[in-house]
Swiss-Prot record:
Organism of origin: Chlamydia muridarum (strain MoPn / Nigg)
Keyword Glycosyltransferase included in the entry's annotation: no
Transmembrane segments: none
Functional description taken from the UniProt entry: Might have a role analogous to that of eukaryotic histone proteins.
Keyword terms: DNA-binding, Repeat
Official protein name in the record: Histone H1-like protein HC1
One of the record's GO molecular function terms: DNA binding
Amino acid sequence: MALKDTAKKMTDLLESIQQNLLKAEKGNKAAAQRVRTESIKLEKIAKVYRKESIKAEKMGLMKRSKVAAKKAKAAAKKPAKATKVVTKKACTKKTCATKAKAKPVKKAATKTKAKVTKKVRSTKK
């Protein structure tokens, strides 16, 4: 079997499994049985596909076409999106005046120490 034939068989089996799964979900017992048997067939064909794909890769049959290679390179070369740079606008008389009023100057708070009272224990009894 060729690699293309094996891939075609796998896609056909997957489609039939999918259709039978929909029927089995609705309660069709025969469809559920078909899903089980087809999944076993799929396993066997998948093993064959793995072997054939490894052989094809070693022989150089699975190289990308030039069109696919160019698309991959173009996708890799695209730069990441630039982050937005927010520029501050120049102050006009109205905007600067309102900003100055909005931010009042804070005065430094004076620190006051609370008096700590210590309990004195008498040692006399």
